[in-house]
Amino acid sequence: PIRVIIGNPPYSIGQKSANDNAQNQSYPILDQRIADTYVAGSTSTNTKGIYDSYIKAFRWATDRLSPKEGSVIAFISNGAWIDGNSHDGFRASLQKEFDKIYVYDLRGNARTSGELRKREGGGIFDSGSRTPIAITILVRYPEGKRSDSCQIHYHDIGDYLSREDKLRLIKQTKTYRRLDWETIMPNEKNDWINQRDGFFDTLLPLVPEKKY
């Protein structure tokens, strides 16, 4: 049985052509699993990002691991899922399928501007990625020892840090046990950070909702 999967999944939802290195490939069975879990648990009307390759990697890895033995997934990936509204179903599924979750938010979102861009700091992969990056560790206990609720632990690397600053902090930390973890209590919308207050739901929609 497979008990540990470690990797750096590709990100391909923004692929511009078939000549791009990270091609969008069709995996019907995997896509259906995503539809049955991450999409089914979402309230978002825009689910395109849920079929990104790095999200597919999470689904694939989760389904490959042995439920009897207990297992761990450790990925460094696009971190947009942490607070993306369209990723609420993904976050909800992680809570159901794992007993402990550790998210080390390395920030670095280059698709921002002004003061927010400065706060995001440098990208871990430099010019290789414009997305925010996160290290995620998912722990699932063996059958019979599963917890009734998932413990979610979050650590933000900090504001205004250069790429070199971030790499130095990661190297100095050495182990996840040394980080000062914040325990996250998701709200009813399955927000983990930057939680919404529900005011938006009181507004009248301009067009009917539909799934894309």
Residue ranges and their predicted role:
Residues 37-38, 103-109, 114-115, 121:
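Amphipathic helix/helix-loop-helix segment enriched in hydrophobic residues with interspersed Lys/Arg
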Residues 51, 58, 75, 90, ...:
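Phenylalanine-focused residue identity feature
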Residues 1-75, 80-84, 93-103:
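SAM-dependent methyltransferase catalytic-core segment centered on the flexible catalytic loop
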